[in-house]
Amino acid sequence: FFKEKFAMDVVQIIGDPGMKCSRVGILVGGGSLGLGREEMPMQVMEKHDIHVMVCGEITEWTLCAYVNDACMLGMNRALLIIGHERTEEWGMKYMAEWLKPLIPGMPVHFADAREPFKYL
């Protein structure tokens, strides 16, 4: 789903790709970095019993390690890492359309940053 919708070659996953889940959370762009509090994404997952968190980007030594450790302990947790650019792109597309009528006569265009990573 995410690969198709965001035109990506790869979506990173931590956890069991086949696990069943009933609660999914989303932290787009840099929100999954914790907004100044590295522990925030883990606290959100625990407080709201989120099984799968869809993230923009992560701090690997905290969120990645937390979800990986939780999986190894048999907890139902997973992480889908879509990337900063891809998760914020829809907002940038909207912003270009929103700006056009506010500044008539000035060209406003959305420029697709595309998936910045190449995978070997």
Model-derived regions: residue spans:
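Active-site catalytic microenvironments in core metabolic enzymes, especially phosphate/sugar-handling
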Residues: 1-120
